[in-house]
C-alpha cells in the first residue's frame, strides 16, 4: 500500500492541568512532570517532524501554559517551519505571556470552554476558571490571532449549544468546535454520567443546522458527531498512521492520543527512535494501517475506505479485541453494546454526576 507522510503533529507537552474535567480523554495513568521531554528534546522532535513532512503542530496537554519553557518550545516549532496552535484552558494566560508567545511564532489559539454560565462551567471543570477563560479570549482577540473555541459536549452541557454559539460570537471567536465526548481515558470511567440521550443530541444537531444557516461565514461551526448515537463509526484520525501522529509528554509516539490503551502495541519513543523510522516502519504504526488487518464485515464493506473500520481504541474498550469492527457502527456484530448504552441514557436516571479528574500529589 502507498503511505503518505504525516502533515500534523499533536505535541502533548504535559499532562499537568489546573482543571479536573470529568470528560478528560487523557490516559488514566498520566506522565509525571519529571518524565517530560525537555525543551531541547521538543526542538529536535519539531525538526524531525518538519523533515518528515509535518506542516502544523498543536501544542497541547494537559495545560501547555504550565511549561515555563513554553516560549522556547513555540520558537523551536516556528523555527522548524511548523504552523503553531496553542490548545489551552486559558488559565494562566496573561498579556505579557501571550505577547512573548506571539513574538516566538505562535500563530493561533484554541480555547476550551465548558459552559456559558460560570457556575455550570466551574462545576464541570472542577475548578474556578470561567473568568480566566473570558480574560484569555479578550487577550487572544486583541492580539489578532486566529481564535477558536472548543466545547466538549456531554449530558450536562449539550442543551446549551445555542448559548455556546452566542458565547463564541460575544468573545470574538472565528470558529467553535462542538465536539461530542470521546470516551477514552478518564471519560470512559464517567461514560454513564456523561452520555447524552438521543433526544438531547437531536435537539443540539438541529440548533447547529439552524445557526449555520443564519450565521453563514460569520462563525465557523464544527459539529463532531456522536458516533454512539449516529450508528456511524468515526474514521480513526483519518486512518491509523495515515495523516498525523501524537507525541506524549514523555516522548512516546502514538498513531492517536488514546492508542496507549491498546495491549501489546509497544509504542516507540523519540528518545530511542527517529520519527521517520517510527512513521514508516514501527510495528505500532503499521499495526492497523491500511486494510489488511480488517476482519469481516469490515473487509468486504463499501465504507472501509471511509471509516477505516472505526476506532481501534473503542473497539478494544467495548469488546476486548482491537481488531473487531468498532461497535459504534450500525453494521458491527457488537453494535448492541452501544445501543444498550444509548438506550440506558434515554431513561430517567436522577441527578447523575461525573467524577472529576484526579491527580497524584507528587505530579499530575
Please give the residue ranges for each predicted region.
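Conserved alpha-helical substructure of the radical SAM core
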Residues: 1-104, 108
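Accessory C-terminal segments flanking Radical SAM cores
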Residues: 222-336
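Radical SAM enzyme [4Fe-4S]-AdoMet core and its adjacent flexible, acidic
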Residues: 32, 103-104, 108, 112-273
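Flexible loop residues that form catalytic
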Residues: 29, 62, 114, 181, ...
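Conserved phosphate-coordination/catalytic loops
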Residues: 36-40, 127-131, 292
Amino acid at each position: 500500500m502507498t503511505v503518505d507522510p504525516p502533515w500534523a503533529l499533536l505535541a502533548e507537552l504535559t499532562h499537568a492541568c489546573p482543571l479536573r474535567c470529568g470528560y478528560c480523554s487523557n490516559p488514566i495513568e498520566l506522565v509525571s512532570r519529571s518524565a517530560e521531554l525537555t525543551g531541547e528534546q521538543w526542538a529536535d522532535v519539531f525538526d524531525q517532524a518538519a523533515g518528515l513532512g509535518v506542516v502544523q503542530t498543536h501544542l497541547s496537554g494537559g495545560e501547555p501554559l504550565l511549561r515555563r519553557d513554553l516560549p522556547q518550545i513555540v520558537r523551536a516549532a516556528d523555527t522548524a517551519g511548523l504552523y503553531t496552535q496553542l490548545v489551552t484552558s486559558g488559565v494562566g494566560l496573561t498579556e505579557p505571556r501571550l505577547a512573548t508567545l506571539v513574538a516566538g511564532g505562535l500563530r493561533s489559539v484554541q480555547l476550551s470552554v465548558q459552559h456559558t454560565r460560570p457556575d455550570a462551567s466551574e462545576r464541570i471543570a472542577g475548578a474556578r476558571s470561567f473568568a480566566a477563560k473570558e480574560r484569555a479570549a479578550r487577550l487572544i482577540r486583541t492580539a489578532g490571532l486566529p481564535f477558536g473555541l472548543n466545547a466538549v459536549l456531554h449530558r450536562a452541557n449539550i442543551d446549551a449549544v445555542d448559548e455556546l454559539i452566542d458565547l463564541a460570537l460575544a468573545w470574538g471567536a472565528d470558529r467553535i468546535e462542538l465536539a461530542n465526548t470521546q470516551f477514552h481515558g478518564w471519560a470512559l470511567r464517567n461514560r454513564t454520567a456523561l452520555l447524552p440521550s438521543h433526544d438531547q443530541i437531536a435537539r443540539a444537531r438541529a440548533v447547529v443546522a439552524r445557526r449555520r444557516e443564519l450565521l453563514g461565514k460569520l462563525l465557523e461551526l464544527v459539529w463532531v458527531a456522536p458516533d454512539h448515537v449516529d450508528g456511524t463509526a468515526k474514521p480513526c484520525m483519518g486512518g491509523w498512521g495515515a495523516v498525523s501522529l501524537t507525541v506524549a509528554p514523555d516522548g512516546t509516539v502514538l498513531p492517536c492520543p488514546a492508542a496507549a490503551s491498546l495491549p501489546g502495541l509497544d509504542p516507540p519513543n523519540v528518545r530511542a527512535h527517529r520519527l521517520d523510522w517510527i512513521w514508516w516502519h514501527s510495528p505500532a504504526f503499521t499495526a492497523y494501517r491500511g486494510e489488511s488487518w480488517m476482519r469481516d464485515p469490515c473487509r468486504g464493506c463499501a465504507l472501509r475506505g471511509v471509516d477505516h473500520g472505526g476506532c481501534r481504541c473503542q473497539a478494544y474498550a467495548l469488546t476486548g479485541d482491537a481488531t473487531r469492527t468498532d461497535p459504534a457502527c450500525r453494521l458491527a456484530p457488537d453494535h448492541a453494546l452501544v445501543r444498550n448504552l444509548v438506550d440506558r441514557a434515554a431513561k430517567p436516571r436522577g441527578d447523575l454526576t461525573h467524577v472529576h479528574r484526579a491527580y497524584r500529589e507528587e505530579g499530575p
